[in-house]
Amino acid sequence: MPELPEVETVCRGLNQLTFGQTIRGGKVLLPRTLAYPVSIEEFLEQINNATFGQWQRRGKYLLVPLEEKKGWLGVHLRMTGQLLWVKQNEPLSRHTRLRLFCDRSKELRFVDIRTFGKVWWVPPNQPPETIITGLQKLGLEPFSNAFSLDYFIDKLKGRQRNIKTILLDQSVVAGIGNIYADEALFKSGIRPTTLGKELSQPQVKRLREAMIEVLKTAIEEGGTTFSDFRGVTGINGNYSGVAWVYGRHNQPCRVCGTPIERIKLGGRSSHFCPQCQPLGNKK
């Protein structure tokens, strides 16, 4: 699933290419892609002749205000969603779910192999979270000033779950997923099986700083492409080439040379270095 860096990469690409573009019609090729409204006719009627404002990212959601008081569009890429800015005569992928036609023979396509992705239209004068209810459950953004050490310590205090699972909880920190949880835990020297309540203040401080550093690096690299993620122009992300542990099972640790191990936690694969992330380390 695209995580914060991938969604941020898409957001920045959309702002470069679609800001000020006007929607001149569209086609919904898979009706269940629409989360709201479910009526294809109403959706297309409401967005027709609307102009894209500045795209925003909230957690793993993409939001854009539509000028001319046309409301908002919201998108969640889920597992395999892609937003691609292409020429209208570009060959159509069989996984294309939505087409929004714009000026100069361009269009914004939503391509989604697994079909879990969702698109919302939010009526004017309504906050997006009233329609896209998942927004209400999100925790702080890791780049926000409010994501302080005190906030993070408070969120981990007394927690009986392992730290990897906690980091994946979107109500704690918005946008972190499997890849960057593993990477941040490696950078901070914390084993993913460590319980939240067992972390010392220096460890929490290190983890917070590592999360921010890893996310910034991943954004600079255009995100991670292991299978389906693409930027708005179809370009792959490059972070996998510099990843510390994720996707590197049995390969030597980039720091100490110890083979990277992989275990299952909460149904997800977790990668770590047993040497650099020792059990019971409180420092």
UniProtKB/Swiss-Prot annotation:
Which chemical reaction does it catalyze? Hydrolysis of DNA containing ring-opened 7-methylguanine residues, releasing 2,6-diamino-4-hydroxy-5-(N-methyl)formamidopyrimidine; 2'-deoxyribonucleotide-(2'-deoxyribose 5'-phosphate)-2'-deoxyribonucleotide-DNA = a 3'-end 2'-deoxyribonucleotide-(2,3-dehydro-2,3-deoxyribose 5'-phosphate)-DNA + a 5'-end 5'-phospho-2'-deoxyribonucleoside-DNA + H(+)
A single GO molecular-function term is: class I DNA-(apurinic or apyrimidinic site) endonuclease activity
> Its domain of life?
Bacteria
What protein does this entry describe? Formamidopyrimidine-DNA glycosylase
Can you state the subunit structure given in the record?
Answer: Monomer.
| Active site: residue positions | P2, E3, K60, R268
Family annotation (InterPro entries)? DNA_glyclase/AP_lyase_DNA-bd, DNA_glyclase_Znf_dom_DNA_BS, Formamido-pyr_DNA_Glyclase, FPG_cat, MutM-like_N-ter, Ribosomal_uS13-like_H2TH, Znf_DNA_glyclase/AP_lyase, Znf_FPG/IleRS
Q: What does this protein do?
A: Involved in base excision repair of DNA damaged by oxidation or by mutagenic agents. Acts as a DNA glycosylase that recognizes and removes damaged bases. Has a preference for oxidized purines, such as 7,8-dihydro-8-oxoguanine (8-oxoG). Has AP (apurinic/apyrimidinic) lyase activity and introduces nicks in the DNA strand. Cleaves the DNA backbone by beta-delta elimination to generate a single-strand break at the site of the removed base with both 3'- and 5'-phosphates.
Classification of source organism? Bacteria, Bacillati, Cyanobacteriota, Cyanophyceae, Oscillatoriophycideae
| Amino-acid positions noted as binding DNA in the UniProt annotation, renumbered to this chain | H95, R114, R159
**GO BP annotations listed:** base-excision repair
Free-text comment on the cofactor: Binds 1 zinc ion per subunit.
Chain ranges of zinc fingers (FPG-type): 244-278
Tell me which SMART domains the record gives.
Answer: Fapy_DNA_glyco, H2TH
Q: Does the keyword DNA-binding apply?
A: yes
Cofactor(s) needed by this chain? Zn(2+)
EC no. given is 3.2.2.23, 4.2.99.18
Q: Which Pfam families match?
A: Fapy_DNA_glyco, H2TH, zf-FPG_IleRS
Does DNA repair appear among the keywords?
A: yes
**NCBIfam families this protein is in?**
fpg (TIGR00577), PRK01103.1 (NF002211), PRK13945.1 (NF010551)
What the record says about family reads: Belongs to the FPG family.
Keywords linked to the UniProt accession: DNA damage, DNA repair, DNA-binding, Glycosidase, Hydrolase, Lyase, Metal-binding, Multifunctional enzyme, Zinc, Zinc-finger
